[in-house]
Amino acid sequence: MSYITKQDKVIAEAIEREFQRQNSNIELIASENFVSEAVMEAQGSVLTNKYAEGYPGRRYYGGCEFVDVTESIAIDRAKALFGAEHVNVQPHSGSQANMAVYLVALEMGDTVLGMNLRHGGHLTHGAPVNFSGKFYNFVEYGVDKDTERINYDEVRKLALEHKPKLIVAGASAYSRTIDFKKFKEIADEVNAKLMVDMAHIAGLVAAGLHPNPVEYADFVTTTTHKTLRGPRGGMILCKEEYKKDIDKTIFPGIQGGPLEHVIAAKAVAFGEALENNFKTYQQQVVKNAKVLAEALINEGFRIVSGGTDNHLVAVDVKGSIGLTGKEAEETLDSVGITCNKNTIPFDQEKPFVTSGIRLGTPAATTRGFDEKAFEEVAKIISLALKNSKDEEKLQQAKERVAKLTAEYPLYQ
């Protein structure tokens, strides 16, 4: 920070305050994590200076021999992690990875089957406000009203009725194991291609704790942060037959020069994910999520689908204690717990209000939180939300958060 402090005190102060916020708060946003110092060092390296349009060995600029090394390593490590035939590590984000697949697999106006955003899908899976919903004819599938799990019979029925050219599996707020084999069977039945967006569960897949979609899907997209614990970015994994189309769609199709400093950071993160302790970490992520869900149930909260198989827990706060998701998010933030309001299946509230909150265990698990710590987290959440107008109780919750975060300091 010494160079930033000398050059730009305002930015240096903002960065320092953000570090203090991360260190003193319990981070429960399911899509966030804490990268290693090695990942941060790679992302802040001299590679940020290098333009490298093209791909390793096929660049439009000179002087790319060393970024060729880092990008090639990122590709090879990603292939090893997921067993993919081809990998493109250049997408700047998960959304751009999804866009590239759509451009390869679809024509404007084609029909696509994707998960309803309110049921746990993602903006890029056909939301009307997103490019995906504007450019393509998305038909939405959802979860069963009683079980709050994906209804594969409904997916099949919709596929047979609408004959989509592409089926999209994957979610941003779905806490159960996704059956990619069933999705593949449905896609084959209607002669559709299958794309899986595994952004949220990529780390679990890499560790063998969730079925690997690469075996079944024509295209797999992901972010490289979240459970994978790398820098913010995207990635596409596909079968060899789609290699040329995917690569030319990313560059020169929708992107120019790749962010080679970010790609180097991806390579470092993938290397970390190939180590044995990464599986141990992911196992703890899932254990902690199950403990968090069970402890909240014991505190009287209704958990969407009754529990979790992965890293996230969706809580129906409106149905449990009468608070909206927005009110719950603000209350928890006031005591040092960061989460996000989230719609739940069949939610009647607006997206900026919601009936639920989404909680995730990856970031706090990276800090070292174990099952006992997450039992305490659940009790603090309950104390704060059930006493959202009681300053004395909120202060007690705040003090308990401070005690927990002091036990598990960040980057120390």
From Swiss-Prot:
Its EC number is 2.1.2.1. Pathway: One-carbon metabolism; tetrahydrofolate interconversion; Amino-acid biosynthesis; glycine biosynthesis; glycine from L-serine: step 1/1. It catalyses: (6R)-5,10-methylene-5,6,7,8-tetrahydrofolate + glycine + H2O = (6S)-5,6,7,8-tetrahydrofolate + L-serine. The record marks 225 as: Plays an important role in substrate specificity. Its cofactor is pyridoxal 5'-phosphate. One of its GO terms (cellular component) is cytosol. The keyword Transferase applies. Keywords: Amino-acid biosynthesis, Cytoplasm, One-carbon metabolism, Pyridoxal phosphate, Transferase. GO terms for biological process: glycine biosynthetic process from serine; tetrahydrofolate interconversion. (6S)-5,6,7,8-tetrahydrofolate binds at residues 117, 121-123. It is found in: Cytoplasm. One of its GO terms (molecular function) is pyridoxal phosphate binding. The modification N6-(pyridoxal phosphate)lysine is found at residue 226. It comes from the Bacteria. Catalyzes the reversible interconversion of serine and glycine with tetrahydrofolate (THF) serving as the one-carbon carrier. This reaction serves as the major source of one-carbon groups required for the biosynthesis of purines, thymidylate, methionine, and other important biomolecules. Also exhibits THF-independent aldolase activity toward beta-hydroxyamino acids, producing glycine and aldehydes, via a retro-aldol mechanism. Homodimer. Belongs to the SHMT family. PANTHER family: SERINE HYDROXYMETHYLTRANSFERASE, SERINE HYDROXYMETHYLTRANSFERASE 1. This is Serine hydroxymethyltransferase. The lineage of its organism: Bacteria, Bacillati, Bacillota, Bacilli, Bacillales.
